Amino acid sequence: MALYNPYRSDMVATLGETTGFVARQLMLYRMKQDPVGREILRLQPRVKSWTVDLNEMRSLQEGTFGREYARFMDDNGLDQDSRDDVKFVDDIELAYVMQRYRDIHDFTHTLTGLPTVSVAGEIAVKWFEMVQTGLPMCTLGSIFGPLNPEVTPKHREQLRSYYIPWALSNGMKAKFIMNVFYERHFEEPIDSLRKKMNLTPARRLDGW
């Protein structure tokens, strides 16, 4: 079910934790090679309602990363506390790597400009995350997700012709998403942060 339906967050979370040991090790290694990544591992920040105040984000200047993140959460009716905690990864460091990946998912949506209101939007993000992280759950979701009956033929064609090539290109050239301390960039213009990350947001095609 998790392969076809990225909305089943419980099953997606379980699949992510029970697969991908080697990918998590590589993610941890890449974080340890980067000064910001090391700081994130040391401080282990979480993205929860008590750590990131959406009311404060809503009050930020238009066009800032924090304001756009709050808008994304509001527009999609999302809850910061809905992300499951990691349960099936025993190693403390590797468990946090998985948790951080999960916690920043909505930051990734915000920065890439990809919607979460459709299965197709989640599939496009999974392609980007697959290239960035190598996690099997992202790979499987990328491959099998388009077979979901909720993905319309039009969206399937748009994935093939634009969003998947966009995800592959940006996934390879963009800064490693795990090595960005997003919480320190809320007051920065979102386009400035994208530039620092070498990330080009996806265009919104018709129907997205």
UniProtKB/Swiss-Prot annotation:
InterPro entries registered for this protein in UniProt: Coq4, Coq4_euk
GO cellular component: extrinsic component of mitochondrial inner membrane; mitochondrion
Pathway given in the UniProt record: Cofactor biosynthesis; ubiquinone biosynthesis
Cofactor(s) for this UniProt protein: Zn(2+)
Pfam family, one: Coq4
Superkingdom of origin organism: Eukaryota
GO BP terms in the entry: ubiquinone biosynthetic process
Tagged with keyword RNA-binding: no
Keywords: Lyase, Membrane, Metal-binding, Mitochondrion, Mitochondrion inner membrane, Ubiquinone biosynthesis, Zinc
Family, per entry: Belongs to the COQ4 family.
Additional record remark: This protein may be expected to contain an N-terminal transit peptide but none has been predicted.
Function comment: Lyase that catalyzes the C1-decarboxylation of 4-hydroxy-3-methoxy-5-(all-trans-polyprenyl)benzoic acid into 2-methoxy-6-(all-trans-polyprenyl)phenol during ubiquinone biosynthesis.
PANTHER family listed in its UniProt record: UBIQUINONE BIOSYNTHESIS PROTEIN, UBIQUINONE BIOSYNTHESIS PROTEIN COQ4 HOMOLOG, MITOCHONDRIAL
Protein name: Ubiquinone biosynthesis protein COQ4 homolog, mitochondrial
Organism: Nematostella vectensis (Starlet sea anemone)
